[in-house]
């Protein structure tokens, strides 16, 4: 008997809901939200678009252009949230400070936030931003799942070695609560594992398919 992950159908129906420059503009704080975070150029928008089978999240050759909290509805009570990209050098310092202020406000205040998907470029993992997010997740008790993106840029062996190395570093520094996987948007690598995490956080059960 095959088992169908219900999050797949919801992701395929994802629609843009709204953009918020600050927490006060976010949707009502109820239901289930999963946020996608990552340094600029870590492949966050590409991952979101691949998971939803759509071009919902804006991709740009200029990293750091995502300046707002962007909300995408899966159904009446479940949402994905594209957080501002962080760390692009050409972004003016006042704008960086604005992003950081409202990113911290969102992460610290949303009762409906069930988990954070953190994107790391598999070739450059564990940046200062990544460690800051891991510190926050541990302190707040927030579930976190890491996508080591752009896995297609490495050989299978090199990707696996990086996965094991980052896993070990996270366990030593932050414990066992954070999960991690390889992911490639162009190759659609790691989709099912990511869908299982989303379904678990959004309290959706797998359904048997005859």
Swiss-Prot record:
Gene3D superfamilies: P-loop containing nucleotide triphosphate hydrolases. GO terms for biological process: division septum assembly. Its cofactor is Mg(2+). GO terms for cellular component: cytosol. Mg(2+) binds at residues 45, 66. CDD domains: YihA_EngB. Keywords: Cell cycle, Cell division, GTP-binding, Magnesium, Metal-binding, Nucleotide-binding, Septation. GTP binds at residues 38-45, 64-68, 82-85, 149-152, 182-185. Residues 30-204 form the EngB-type G domain. InterPro entries: G_ENGB_dom, GTP-bd, GTP-bd_ribosome_bio_YsxC, P-loop_NTPase. GO terms for molecular function: GTP binding; metal ion binding. Belongs to the TRAFAC class TrmE-Era-EngA-EngB-Septin-like GTPase superfamily. EngB GTPase family. Necessary for normal cell division and for the maintenance of normal septation. NCBIfam families: GTPase_YsxC. This is Probable GTP-binding protein EngB. It comes from Pseudomonas entomophila (strain L48).
């Amino acid at each position: 008997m095959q088992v169908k992950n219900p999050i797949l159908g919801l992701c395929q129906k994802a629609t843009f809901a709204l953009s918020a420059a600050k927490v006060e503009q976010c949707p009502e704080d109820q239901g289930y939200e999963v946020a996608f975070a990552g340094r600029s150029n870590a492949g966050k928008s590409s991952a979101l678009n691949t998971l939803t089978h759509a071009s919902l999240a804006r991709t740009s050759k200029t990293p750091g252009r995502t300046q707002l909290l962007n909300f995408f509805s899966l159904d009446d009570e479940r949402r994905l949230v594209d957080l501002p990209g962080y760390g692009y050098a050409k972004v003016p310092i006042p704008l960086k400070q604005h992003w950081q202020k409202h990113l911290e406000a969102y992460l610290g205040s949303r009762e409906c936030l069930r988990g954070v998907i953190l994107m790391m470029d598999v070739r450059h993992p564990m940046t200062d931003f990544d460690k800051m997010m891991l510190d926050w997740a541990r302190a707040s008790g927030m579930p976190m799942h890491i996508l080591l993106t752009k896995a297609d840029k490495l050989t299978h062996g090199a990707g696996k070695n990086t996965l094991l190395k980052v896993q070990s570093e996270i366990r030593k520094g932050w414990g066992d609560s954070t999960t991690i996987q390889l992911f490639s948007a162009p190759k659609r690598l790691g989709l099912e594992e990511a869908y299982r995490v989303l379904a678990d956080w959004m309290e959706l059960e797998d359904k048997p398919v005859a």
